[in-house]
């Protein structure tokens, strides 16, 4: 209780400061365990909380903390300070919390300090109480820690008028039995914690029955000598009967005999104490004390924690009998290695029993019919194994509402019998056991709160007893692969299912669980596929207060490309997840593509191109069957000329005369095409038997369909032979917009190839004819000419 109270004061002060101040790191400075030998000089003037504990500081000067005008909490415990002048804090007017415990202080010099709420001078080397008259002005003081080896009643007078919430008094190792027994009587405090010297037989006569004290804690009690029989300590406890205000008594770190331990219990039994707690006990010797007097007690709760005992030289049933027949409402025995507990000999008033962290087995309270008033039973961390036996144990506990059997080795085997629970049970904690899916066939019918986390559950069977009253279910840290739904749990409002194997949660979960007000399902290996999309959509319709940990704890685990992605950021297109829509889209796309291709074929005259390709292919196939020498002999012309009929005047009067006068053999369609052959075949033959193909380009050319065909086959021959056999003569300029779309090859050729432009000036024509003759000049064989 002392540590809790101490912590609460610190926590409230720090919380108050954090509310009032910004949370910037410069306000909170922690230099503990840094090996410091003096107070750091680089502290910010805004420092509010300074922790320099567990260092080697031996002195504290005004200059060390002069600049820290906003300092409220200073923790300088566990250092080597021997002398302190409290005036060093005269410039720290906001200082409220000062911890100087666990130093080597032997003397202090006082100075008026009115704002301190917490002052700890305990565990130091003072000979007398370090209380001076200036302490009397600390009207806000709530905690005072002191240490001394010499106690006098007069030392307390300066602060007797102060109402201090908690006083901690540490008595030095030289404190003895000759000290003033009334030295504590002038303390005005609600809570008093006295720490006696360690490892020293208790021979003190101090009167701890301070009239204002409601909470008393005594630490370091050693009385193991048989001749002593713990008489000194028992005398101190006996005086507590004169303090009607005392309601809480705590004993820490006790080393005594079994007889003395039971005597302590017996003595406290007849005081005004309501709550009695004993912890860290070491017991030895025999137990002869058998006749425990339970009458006339005010005690409501007894707690015994962490007991170590030598080898028992007496039947343990003596102890169990004393414990089981106690006429109190709340009884706790934990960390004692207790192996059994007897059933009370008559109807017991126990309402709350806590036997956690012991060695109890399934036989505890077997066939016990005297715990009819019991409401809460805690058996966690024991040696329980068979659930059916535990359930049977509860059948005679007609008032039992809460049962905790967590952290055992409990399992359920259907072959070993059915489960019969008390009908009154409302809350059941079976976490951290080895339970499997079968547990859902062995549950109390009226259960409201069920904790099954950290077991071996893989699924919740559909054929289970309907738990219509179940409101809270915790199945975290199992191996569940889906959210359970509320078909069998119609009242379920709280579900904890984090850290399982849920990958594809059911999309209709929220529809089936209309009463859900809190669900914690994060930290599962969600597979971000189409199936998860519906679940995520349903989450968007749920309040953020319902889904705990959303969105940070809900992440994709698969596929690898999505791993680590928050579910709220995961999206898949409707098309990829809807098969029907995908098929319709594909069919529609194919139809559109078919219509488009058909239209393009019609517009670009694709059938004609196909026919021409067939003719070209047939001609080329025939040509491949002719030997190379014969192909060379077949080269009969220097050039084939393709032109529009509208340009025939220029061809016959300009082009032919200038070429043929130099002996050039020219192929013209009106004089060299073979009658009877198809026009296409004549064109192909003429192109193949010509060294070059000359095209006379003009606006008339692009309007001629046959010119188009001739250009098409010449272009094919160009790429097939890998030669440079194409010559373009631009007779008249051709605007790009006037070239039909079907002449796309002409556009391409004009963009990529150099052409000869017919000059209008006569002076330039000589060079034109020279270039043209040079381009088509080749020596034909005599046989080819013939």
From Swiss-Prot:
It is found in: Cell membrane; Cytoplasmic vesicle, Phagosome membrane; Membrane raft; Golgi apparatus. GO terms for cellular component: Golgi apparatus; membrane; membrane raft; phagocytic vesicle membrane; plasma membrane; receptor complex; Toll-like receptor 1-Toll-like receptor 2 protein complex. GO terms for biological process: cellular response to triacyl bacterial lipopeptide; detection of triacyl bacterial lipopeptide; immune response; inflammatory response; innate immune response; macrophage activation; microglial cell activation; positive regulation of interleukin-6 production. Pfam families: LRR_8, LRRCT, TIR. LRR repeats lie at residues 54-77, 78-101, 102-125, 126-150, 151-175, 176-199, 200-223, 224-250, 251-278, 279-308, 309-337, 338-361, 362-388, 389-414, 415-437, 438-457, 458-478, 479-500, 501-524. Disulfide bonds join 110-132, 223-230, 343-368, 419-442. Changing residue 602 to I: Severe impairment of activity. The chain crosses the membrane at residues 581-601. It is a single-pass type I membrane protein. The keyword Mitochondrion does not apply. Ubiquitous. Highly expressed in spleen, ovary, peripheral blood leukocytes, thymus and small intestine. Residues 525-579 form the LRRCT domain. The keyword Ligase does not apply. SMART domains: LRR_BAC, LRR_TYP, LRRCT, TIR. Residues 1-24 form the signal peptide. Keywords: Cell membrane, Cytoplasmic vesicle, Disulfide bond, Glycoprotein, Golgi apparatus, Immunity, Inflammatory response, Innate immunity, Leucine-rich repeat, Membrane, NAD, Receptor, Repeat, Signal, Transmembrane, Transmembrane helix. Residues 602-786 are cytoplasmic. Residues 635-776 form the TIR domain. Interacts (via extracellular domain) with TLR2. TLR2 seems to exist in heterodimers with either TLR1 or TLR6 before stimulation by the ligand. The heterodimers form bigger oligomers in response to their corresponding ligands as well as further heterotypic associations with other receptors such as CD14 and/or CD36. The activation cluster TLR2:TLR1:CD14 forms in response to triacylated lipopeptides. Binds MYD88 (via TIR domain). Interacts with CNPY3. Belongs to the Toll-like receptor family. Participates in the innate immune response to microbial agents. Specifically recognizes diacylated and triacylated lipopeptides. Cooperates with TLR2 to mediate the innate immune response to bacterial lipoproteins or lipopeptides. Forms the activation cluster TLR2:TLR1:CD14 in response to triacylated lipopeptides, this cluster triggers signaling from the cell surface and subsequently is targeted to the Golgi in a lipid-raft dependent pathway. Acts via MYD88 and TRAF6, leading to NF-kappa-B activation, cytokine secretion and the inflammatory response. This is Toll-like receptor 1. The lineage of its organism: Eukaryota, Metazoa, Chordata, Craniata, Vertebrata.
């Amino acid at each position: 209780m002392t540590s809790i109270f101490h912590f609460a004061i610190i926590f409230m002060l720090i919380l108050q400061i954090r509310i009032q101040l910004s949370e910037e790191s410069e306000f909170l400075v922690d230099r503990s365990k840094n090996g410091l030998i003096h107070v750091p000089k680089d502290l910010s003037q805004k420092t509010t909380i300074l922790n320099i504990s567990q260092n080697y500081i031996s002195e504290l000067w005004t200059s060390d903390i002069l600049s820290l005008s906003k300092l409220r909490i200073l923790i300088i415990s566990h250092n080597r300070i021997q002398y302190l002048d409290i005036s060093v804090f005269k410039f720290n007017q906001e200082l409220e919390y000062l911890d100087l415990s666990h130093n080597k202080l032997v003397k202090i010099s006082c100075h008026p300090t009115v704002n301190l709420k917490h002052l700890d001078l305990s565990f130091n080397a003072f000979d007398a109480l370090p209380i001076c008259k200036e302490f009397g002005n600390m009207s806000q003081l709530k905690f005072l820690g002191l240490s001394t080896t010499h106690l006098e009643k007069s030392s307390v007078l300066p602060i007797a008028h102060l109402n201090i919430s908690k006083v901690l008094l540490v008595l030095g190792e030289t404190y003895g039995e000759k000290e003033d027994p009334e030295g504590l009587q002038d303390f005005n405090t609600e809570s008093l914690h006295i720490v006696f010297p360690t490892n020293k037989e208790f021979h003190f006569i101090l009167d701890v029955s301070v009239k204002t004290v409601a909470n008393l804690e005594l630490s370091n009690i050693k009385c193991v000598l048989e001749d002593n029989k713990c008489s000194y300590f028992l005398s101190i406890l006996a005086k507590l009967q004169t303090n009607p205000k005392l309601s809480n008594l705590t004993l820490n770190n006790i080393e005594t005999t079994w007889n003395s331990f039971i005597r302590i219990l017996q003595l406290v039994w007849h005081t005004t104490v309501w709550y009695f707690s004993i912890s860290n006990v070491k017991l030895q010797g025999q137990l002869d004390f058998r006749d425990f007097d339970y009458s006339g007690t005010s005690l409501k709760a007894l707690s015994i924690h962490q007991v170590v005992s030598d080898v028992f030289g007496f039947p343990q049933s003596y102890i169990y009998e004393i414990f089981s027949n106690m006429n109190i409402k709340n009884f706790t025995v934990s960390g004692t290695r207790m192996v059994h507990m007897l059933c009370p000999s008559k109807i017991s008033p126990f309402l709350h029993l806590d036997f956690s962290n012991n060695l109890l087995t399934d036989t505890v309270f077997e066939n016990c019919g005297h715990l009819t008033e019991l409401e809460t039973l805690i058996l966690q961390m024991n040696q329980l194994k068979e659930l059916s036996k535990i359930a049977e144990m509860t059948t005679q506990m007609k008032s039992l509402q809460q049962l905790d059997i967590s952290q055992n080795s409990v399992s359920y085997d259907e072959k070993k019998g059915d489960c019969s629970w008390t009908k009154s049970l409302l809350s059941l904690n079976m976490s951290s056991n080895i339970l499997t899916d079968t547990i859902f066939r062995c549950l109390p019918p009226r259960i409201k709160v069920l904790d099954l986390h950290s077991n071996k559950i893989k699924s919740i069977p559909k054929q289970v007893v309907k738990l219509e009253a179940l409101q809270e279910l915790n199945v975290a840290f199992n191996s569940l692969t889906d959210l359970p739904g509320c078909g069998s749990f119609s009242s379920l409002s709280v579900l904890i299912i984090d850290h399982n194997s849920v990958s594809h949660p059911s999309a209709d979960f929220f529809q089936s669980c209309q009463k859900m007000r809190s669900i914690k399902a994060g930290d599962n290996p969600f597979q971000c596929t189409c199936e998860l999309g519906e679940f995520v959509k349903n989450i968007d319709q749920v309040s953020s207060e319902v889904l705990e940990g959303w969105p940070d704890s809900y992440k994709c685990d698969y596929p690898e490309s999505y791993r680590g992605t928050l579910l709220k950021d995961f999206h898949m297109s409707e098309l990829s997840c809807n098969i029907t829509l995908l098929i319709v889209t594909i069919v529609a796309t194919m139809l559109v593509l078919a219509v488009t291709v058909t239209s393009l074929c019609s517009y670009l005259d694709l059938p004609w191109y196909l026919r021409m390709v067939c003719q070209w292919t047939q001609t080329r196939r025939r040509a491949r069957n002719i030997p190379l020498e014969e192909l060379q002999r077949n080269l009969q012309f220097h050039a084939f000329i393709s032109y529009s009929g509208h340009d025939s005047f220029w061809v016959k009067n300009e082009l032919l005369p200038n070429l043929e006068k130099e002996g050039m053999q020219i192929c013209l369609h009106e004089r060299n095409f073979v009658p009877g052959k198809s026009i296409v075949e004549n064109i192909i033959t003429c192109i193949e038997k010509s060294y070059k193909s000359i095209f006379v380009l003009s606006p008339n050319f692009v309007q001629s369909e046959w010119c188009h065909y001739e250009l098409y086959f010449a272009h094919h021959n160009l790429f097939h032979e890998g030669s440079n056999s194409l010559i373009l003569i631009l007779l008249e300029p051709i605007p790009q917009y006037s070239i039909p779309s079907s002449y796309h090859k002409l556009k391409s050729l004009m963009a990529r190839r150099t052409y000869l432009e017919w000059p209008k000036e006569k002076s330039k024509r000589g060079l034109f004819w020279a270039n043209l003759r040079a381009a088509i000049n080749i020596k034909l064989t005599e046989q080819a000419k013939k």
